Amino acid sequence: MTYDYKSKIYLAEAVLNVKDLARQTAFYTQIMGLGILSQTETEVVLGAGNKPLVHLIQTNHEQAVKSSYGLYHMAILLPSREDLADVFKHIAELDYPFVGAADHGYSEALYLEDLEGNGIELYRDKPVAEWDIREDGRIVGVTEELSAQEIYEMGRKVEPFVIAEETRMGHIHLSVKDSQLASAFYQEVLELADKFTIPSASWIASGDYHHHLAVNEWGGKNLAKREEDMPGLAYYIVEVEDKGDLIAIAERANNRGAEVKWLSSNALTFEDNDGILTRVRKNINN
């Protein structure tokens, strides 16, 4: 498998600990239009077509999602502007609230939260010819007003609504204590490059993409370190093309002093300074 934009990684899934599995499952199916791919009494895997995107795990912990570092938002990438318009119209006509919208120069994005406060971005990428790509490979992002009415009017009303089959996880944006420290950590461990940085946030990517990961410290310096079973991000999944990439990531994480756990011969997790877990696995098709 060859990844888009000459990337060496692929964002696969976000795995969330949730306090009310039934209500959250209803949100992701009825509001977001994802399908249930597998289900037990304590876990639900949801996706687009046959591709898992969001994995929900029941937790008995009661902390608020935003009381700890972890997920800022998971960014779900629609294959076209028309597909973004369809999901926009569907959610808007259900009167479910959006918390923001923006034209970022390289993408058009809508923002909302699930029922427990996990951030979600729905976006579509503009053609690469429209991106502000600098000579050094950096890709400048902006935050400008979205042509929301134009996009909404493109939307087709379909019942029952199902999100476009080619939808996938586009990037993961993390809430961290120190964005510069976190950015340097992920750049080294996952071999990502700085694409755009401000004092409080950083956007980093593999290859020529605008960002696969972002980190920001907008939540402040006093949030709790993530612990097992806390509501919110349990971990997110990154895929690599071969076993050699996996071994190299483990070595670089160890060199940074990160705790690395091998889950199998083809999968591992590592933990950053804020307790955020990244799971990396070899692509099963390779």
Predicted features along the sequence, with ranges:
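Vicinal oxygen chelate
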Residues: 9, 16-22, 75-119, 176-180, ...
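Active-site-adjacent scaffolding segments
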Residues: 43-57, 61-103, 110-126, 130-137
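Amphipathic alpha-helical segments
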Residues: 21-35, 90, 178-194
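Short secondary-structure junctions
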Residues: 33-39, 98-99, 191-196, 255-263
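Conserved short beta-strand elements that form part of the metal-binding/catalytic scaffold
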Residues: 35-69, 119-126, 193-230, 270-273, ...
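A mid-sequence, solvent-exposed acidic-amphipathic segment
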Residues: 165-191, 195-199, 205
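N-terminal beta-strand motif that seeds the catalytic metal site of vicinal oxygen chelate
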Residues: 1-22, 129-180, 233-236, 286
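An N-terminus-focused feature that recognizes amino-terminal "leader" regions
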Residues: 2-61, 68-71, 76
